[in-house]
Amino acid sequence: MAEQPAGGQGAGDSRDSRGDRDSRGRRGDGGRGGRDRDGDKSNYLERVVAINRVSKVVKGGRRFSFTALVIVGDGNGMVGVGYGKAKEVPAAIAKGVEEARKGFFRVPLIRGTITHPVQGEAAAGVVLLRPASPGTGVIAGGAARAVLECAGVHDILAKSLGSDNAINVVHATVAALKLLQRPEEVAARRGLPIEDVAPAGMLKARRESDALASAAAAREAAAQ
């Protein structure tokens, strides 16, 4: 009887090693939007909005580097914007992420939308944000959408009224979000009851949202 070639076992080993390589080569869930470099950062959403190559003329010629505009948020009202620069793209993104995390700010939300219409401006960028009813979704362009999704906004109408440059749009969107105020803040500033400042529908949605959050916290406490 002729001996079988050793290729059968080798093919199996090749498949096993290929499987190991595939398992090692998989990136964290979310691709560019959810890199999982360590356990802490896996809790945050990351969006790379723009990557540009820049050059600097020196005596010996040109030196090239990369810049990255990154949005980071927890998907629950916290968001930040960072701008990183380095000789390599991954390093530029990492610097942008760190800067964004240092610049976190809170966005007032009620049931997944903003509290009132607002317009933000930055350089030539102008962005108008309007609240939307549940189920509307995020109606916005790519740059503004990245900021809103990382902030945890689920229903909103956004329109760019100025420059289409991604950097200007991002900073205008951030400027608009920073202008948002809670009904309690407006009532306290005017010296009026909150019922005289905020619409009844907003107050009802606020109460329902608080009730859902309290119920979720109670369930988590009971599970522990």
Swiss-Prot record:
Which GO molecular function entries does the Swiss-Prot or TrEMBL record give?
rRNA binding; structural constituent of ribosome
Q: What is the top-level taxon of the source organism?
A: Bacteria
Region (Disordered) residue ranges read 1-40
Q: Which Gene3D superfamilies match?
A: 3.30.160.20, 3.30.230.10
PROSITE patterns in the record: RIBOSOMAL_S5 (PS00585), S5_DSRBD (PS50881)
Classification via Pfam families:
Ribosomal_S5, Ribosomal_S5_C
Q: Name one GO cellular component term.
A: small ribosomal subunit
* SUPFAM superfamilies named among the record's database cross-references: dsRNA-binding domain-like, Ribosomal protein S5 domain 2-like
Q: Give the compositionally biased regions (Basic and acidic residues).
A: 13-40
| Residue ranges annotated for the S5 DRBM domain, each copy included | 44-107
Assembly and binders: Part of the 30S ribosomal subunit. Contacts proteins S4 and S8.
Entry function: With S4 and S12 plays an important role in translational accuracy. Located at the back of the 30S subunit body where it stabilizes the conformation of the head with respect to the body.
Entry's family note: Belongs to the universal ribosomal protein uS5 family.
Domain description from the entry? The N-terminal domain interacts with the head of the 30S subunit; the C-terminal domain interacts with the body and contacts protein S4. The interaction surface between S4 and S5 is involved in control of translational fidelity.
Q: Which HAMAP family match?
A: Ribosomal_uS5_B
Query: Which NCBIfam families does the annotation name?
Result: rpsE_bact
Q: What is this protein called?
A: Small ribosomal subunit protein uS5
Q: What is the lineage of its organism?
A: Bacteria, Bacillati, Actinomycetota, Actinomycetes, Mycobacteriales
